[in-house]
Amino acid sequence: MHKAPESVLNALVPMVVEQTAKGERSYDIYSRLLKERVIFLVGQVEEHMANLIVAQLLFLESESPDKDIYLYINSPGGSVTAGMAIYDTMQFIKPNVSTVCIGQAASMGAFLLAGGAEGKRHCLPNSRVMIHQPLGGFQGQASDIAIHAQEILGIKNKLNTMLAEHTGQPLEVIERDTDRDNFMSATEAAEYGLVDSVIAKRS
């Protein structure tokens, strides 16, 4: 499938013009929403995206350490290490990070959704959530393959333990339910404990 060049995609980002005492000021829509403490995590979770998310989290903490941050997630998942960089920063900073699933939160996206502040994790009504075990592939000598297999198993156990803590589900239930791709509706995700509520309108 033909992929639009990045320059074209950037040109499609809406601009917002604000009137200030010093005149007009224009922002791209994401920068304007960042002023409202809204961060978007959209697409594949990878290192560059993770660095941008982490930087925004740290910036908003420095601006107002006592005000909530809102992380909107629409992601099919991606790199575990990149995702953990975001997750650890969410737990590290002082502000509560409220997570909201729009569209989908799958794999590492679902993990980050569940990692939001307790009582402040939400799904929109028609969003989808999917959990599963980490994926990995490696080629090389048999001894190196064995090392990587052990690493993946270790990551799997760690993620399952953390997911059990965030959802309140027993570890053995998490292990069973992540053995294969496990898709949930917004309501099912709330019942499972991945989020705290399904929201259709702002209160």
UniProtKB/Swiss-Prot annotation:
Superkingdom of the organism of origin: Bacteria
Keyword Protease: yes
Subcellular location as annotated: Cytoplasm
InterPro entries in the cross-refs: ClpP, ClpP/crotonase-like_dom_sf, ClpP/TepA, ClpP_His_AS, ClpP_Ser_AS
GO molecular function terms listed in the Swiss-Prot or TrEMBL record: ATP-dependent peptidase activity; ATPase binding; serine-type endopeptidase activity
A Pfam family per the record: CLP_protease
A GO cellular component entry from the record: cytoplasm
Active site: S107 (nucleophile), H132
Keywords: Cytoplasm, Hydrolase, Protease, Serine protease
EC number: 3.4.21.92
BP terms from Gene Ontology: protein quality control for misfolded or incompletely synthesized proteins
Catalytic activity field: Hydrolysis of proteins to small peptides in the presence of ATP and magnesium. alpha-casein is the usual test substrate. In the absence of ATP, only oligopeptides shorter than five residues are hydrolyzed (such as succinyl-Leu-Tyr-|-NHMec, and Leu-Tyr-Leu-|-Tyr-Trp, in which cleavage of the -Tyr-|-Leu- and -Tyr-|-Trp bonds also occurs)
Matching PANTHER family: ATP-DEPENDENT CLP PROTEASE PROTEOLYTIC SUBUNIT
The protein's role, per its UniProt record: Cleaves peptides in various proteins in a process that requires ATP hydrolysis. Has a chymotrypsin-like activity. Plays a major role in the degradation of misfolded proteins.
Protein family membership: Belongs to the peptidase S14 family.
Quaternary structure and partners: Fourteen ClpP subunits assemble into 2 heptameric rings which stack back to back to give a disk-like structure with a central cavity, resembling the structure of eukaryotic proteasomes.
Protein name: ATP-dependent Clp protease proteolytic subunit
Source species taxonomy: Bacteria, Pseudomonadati, Pseudomonadota, Gammaproteobacteria, Alteromonadales
The encoding gene: clpP
